[in-house]
């Protein structure tokens, strides 16, 4: 009997999901993306060679693994084709292994224009989107007016819908945002060119997943972004436009929760965030700069510098509850090497002095101060360790304390960027 394993982020994204998905796909017949778009950036390092994936599931670098893009993913055809071409230039066979749901919404040029125009108009109050058109594409989906991958293969129907959409969106772009209109014919011609390339890769992904399940195959579900960026459970409004938590798996793939066997929460050994929004443990001192430098904390999609701070057990407890986490994978432990002391946030103190748990929206974070528990650091290197016994005693104590504070077991520890720099204590597919 096969197992269905989920890999998702428990913080604000950038937790190191790509490496872990790549590591675990050794046991998987298929990997499926179920939400987000090319705003994701999953970095894989294999034998020292770095590859960044945005839309294509991280299993593509494992020979023979089927890669599926589910209905919950918003697909930018131009970005997808660029990614396919780059991988093919490296000798990776993509088209015979990649399949895309016809129900996946399309991101087109007017979505990108709207996204960027809105951020520009917000000025200092900007949310910090990637400007890739993700939000506007999900808006069209929910408003039941969006174009989907399957529409690409019906030219007349596509053209009629596109004309209506451009009338609607160009009115906003020109009259409200004072930006140029998007050209209908150019957009149509581009989309029809992409249609010819995408048609062989279209497949009913939901049906395929259930066929694999019934055949007893192991399947991996690859999340994008992090739990605290979830449209419903994140630090709203500083969130993404999809459900990054476990609930998004079923809606974005068509595989019900009863069939999910193990949910692995990828968790960085410290905390980072890109863009605007609350971040209680953020560091503005030399330690924060050290974490950013050692951890190479720059967004793989946008190149923006990530904000860095101490580990926050409060937000992790919330993520564990919301996602029904089975086990934690602790990443970037080696970045903490050499720090004399390490702080863990165990609660938030409000203006009345009461210690509380994580709020549900961004405004409620105003005025909260982190309550820290100080732990000794370690001088020894953890880089490349492959067994728990190789880690310094202080590092093992740090890991144990995180388990105690969160109530979840740490099943995997990442000690470096390469797939073999990993300690596996309990395998999700076992």
Swiss-Prot record:
It comes from the Bacteria. Pathway: Purine metabolism; AMP biosynthesis via de novo pathway; AMP from IMP: step 1/2. Signal peptide: none annotated. Its EC number is 6.3.4.4. One of its GO terms (molecular function) is magnesium ion binding. SUPFAM superfamilies: P-loop containing nucleoside triphosphate hydrolases. Pfam families: Adenylsucc_synt. Homodimer. This is Adenylosuccinate synthetase.
């Amino acid at each position: 009997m096969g197992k269905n394993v989920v890999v998702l982020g428990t913080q604000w994204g950038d937790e190191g999901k790509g490496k872990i998905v790549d590591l675990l796909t050794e046991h998987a017949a298929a990997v499926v993306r179920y939400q987000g778009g090319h705003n994701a950036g999953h970095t894989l390092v294999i034998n020292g060679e770095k590859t960044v994936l945005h839309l294509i599931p991280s299993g593509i670098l494992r020979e023979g693994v089927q890669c599926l893009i589910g209905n919950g993913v918003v697909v930018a055809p131009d970005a997808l084709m660029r990614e396919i071409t780059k991988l093919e230039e490296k000798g990776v066979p993509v088209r015979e292994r990649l399949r895309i749901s016809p129900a996946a919404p399309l991101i087109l040029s007017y979505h990108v224009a709207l996204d960027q125009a809105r951020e520009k108009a917000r000025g200092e109050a900007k949310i910090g989107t990637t400007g890739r058109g993700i939000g506007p594409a999900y808006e069209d989906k929910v408003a039941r007016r969006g174009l989907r991958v399957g529409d690409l293969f019906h030219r007349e129907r596509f053209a009629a819908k596109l004309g209506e959409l451009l009338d609607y969106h160009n009115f906003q772009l020109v009259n409200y945002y004072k930006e140029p209109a998007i050209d209908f014919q150019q957009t149509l011609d581009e989309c029809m060119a992409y249609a010819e390339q995408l048609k062989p890769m279209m497949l009913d992904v939901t049906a395929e997943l259930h066929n694999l399940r019934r055949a007893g195959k192991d399947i991996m579900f690859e999340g994008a972004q992090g739990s605290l960026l979830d449209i419903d459970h994140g630090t709203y409004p500083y969130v993404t436009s999809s459900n990054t938590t476990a609930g998004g798996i079923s809606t974005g793939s068509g595989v019900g929760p009863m069939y999910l066997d193990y949910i692995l929460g990828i968790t960085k050994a410290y905390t980072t965030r890109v863009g605007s929004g609350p971040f209680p443990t953020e560091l503005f001192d030399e330690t924060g700069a050290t974490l950013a430098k050692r951890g190479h904390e720059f967004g793989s999609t946008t190149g923006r510098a990530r904000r860095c701070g101490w580990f926050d057990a409060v937000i992790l407890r919330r993520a564990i509850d919301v996602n029904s986490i089975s086990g934690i994978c602790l990443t970037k432990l080696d970045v903490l090497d050499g720090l004399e002391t390490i702080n863990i946030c165990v609660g938030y103190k409000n203006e009345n002095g009461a210690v509380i748990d994580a709020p549900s929206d961004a405004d409620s974070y105003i005025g909260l101060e982190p309550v820290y528990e100080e732990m000794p650091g370690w001088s020894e290197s953890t880089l490349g360790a492959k067994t728990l016994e190789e880690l310094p005693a202080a590092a093992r104590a740090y890991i144990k304390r995180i388990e105690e504070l969160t109530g979840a077991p740490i099943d995997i520890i990442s000690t470096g960027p390469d797939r073999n720099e990993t300690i596996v204590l309990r395998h999700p597919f076992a």
